[in-house]
Amino acid sequence: MKKRTGKILALLLSLTMMAGVMAGCGSEKTDGSADSTSTQAATGADTTGKKTFVFGDTTFNAENEESTIDPHSAYCGWACMRYGVGETLMKINDSMKLEPWIAEGYELVDNLTWKITLKDGVCFSNGKPCDAEAVKKCLEDLIAVHERAAGDLKIASMEADGLVLTIHTAEECPSLMNYLSEPYGCIIDVDEGVTDDGIVVGTGPYVATELVTDDHLKLVKNENYWDGNVNIDEITVRTISDGDTLALALQSGEINAAYGMAYASYPIFENDKFQFTSVQTSRSFYVQMNYASPVVADDAVREAIAMGIDKESFVKVLLNGYGYVATGAFPDTVAFGGSTLHAKTYDPEAAKAVLEEAGWTDSDGDGIREKDGQKLTIRWLTYPSRQELPLLAEAAQSTLKEIGIEVQINATADHNTICKDPAAWDVYVGANVNCGLGDPTNFFSTHCLDASTKNRGQYHSDELEELAVKLNSTFDVTERNQIAIEMQQQLLDDDAFVFCSFLKMSMISQANVTGLTAHACDYYELTADLDINEV
């Protein structure tokens, strides 16, 4: 693939788009170009008659480890899949069940060997066939450069024969097919490489032509798409991290649809000019305790925090009901969910008693407890691009103050850097799709174990490690579900996490948009079905 520099062009495009956003914030357009942009987005056609679509997203940015669309880098696979550039061997359907996507099917030959047959006729957007050899090369590159994927997939070797790929794992990996539906598993043409701006060649309905991190991504129709007609000719994905700016852009017609809209803005769009597509998801808003913090390492403090967060009010009031209260890591709607789990509930008086018994008292009467001369202050690290997280921080700050805990909020786009320093924070509060693969393994392997890449708080449990070994060698689904429930209960008993709520995810679009459908695993957004009717 030709390497691209184009820094001057990228800068000019960035400035032009910034001007468009600023124009959308005012009551009047400052020139005709903004009017033209708004009209084009609203009608879905440009002057050449091509169908165009503009999508605003608060989360497509470096803050969320999505600086490019290269699935072999960090969490960029999400953007690759969401925006229709890449597709995976397997996918999760609307019922959260695993099914083949660019694969035709698979077979477990023995506990260490899997055979995957690919669909005939699938090709990359450059016209090259997506055969077993191409998939093998892609997965080899993935596990060579992506630490999390290498740990998940446990691939020892592979063999390619036409449309049949045989995978040998180094150890038993019952969830291998689920992991191959993970966004990092987007199959790309690695022979084409990655451009300087992070563009790859996939098998999806759209082809990326231009990417400026934290600003925009441009896509065009894949003329070689293997799975039917693609309706939209050109798409622009705009990074609009500020919720108010996103709302103004959709109102003014600068964009056709939006992801990540602030709940406070929803009433603006509850009319016949707009439409919502919504679904309950497993995206959990959670508190992760830092065991390296002397304060949070105190069992009583973690227990009090768990009892000092009012989950019900957070969902009903601050989220306007667009969510549901969590017990464990997974929603009740899945077989390994939270219906039989026991978690601490909001109980300020019990929290006060726990702290009092542990020696945390308010001796100077300032409302904040102290022990051995140290104030009970919690440094709350979170980030703003998920509109719900600053709301959760403010709610917890209020309720925890009532029990004598001071909360210092740091909502920053630099959270990924800060959390690497365990001395810089006490609790990390984020959002994660905990069962986007239709299987429980991924959450534990990523966040909770000694070898986990996102075990930010250095949590360790002998019991959890033993259960994880058992889970990773168990193929029976019923047994796996029960092990996952036991693992969640261990986390709750240790107060290692507080699972606050699950997201009811919505995308809002103009009324003339069709084929934009929210999905429970939050992976699939811009598909070949997307269309827009002229108004």
Question: Each PLM stretch: what is its role?
Answer:
Residues 308-338, 388-397, 419-535:
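Detector for C-terminal structural segments
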Residues 104-146, 295:
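Aromatic- and charge-enriched surface segment that lines or borders ligand/interaction sites
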Residues 325-363, 384-391:
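Structural transition elements
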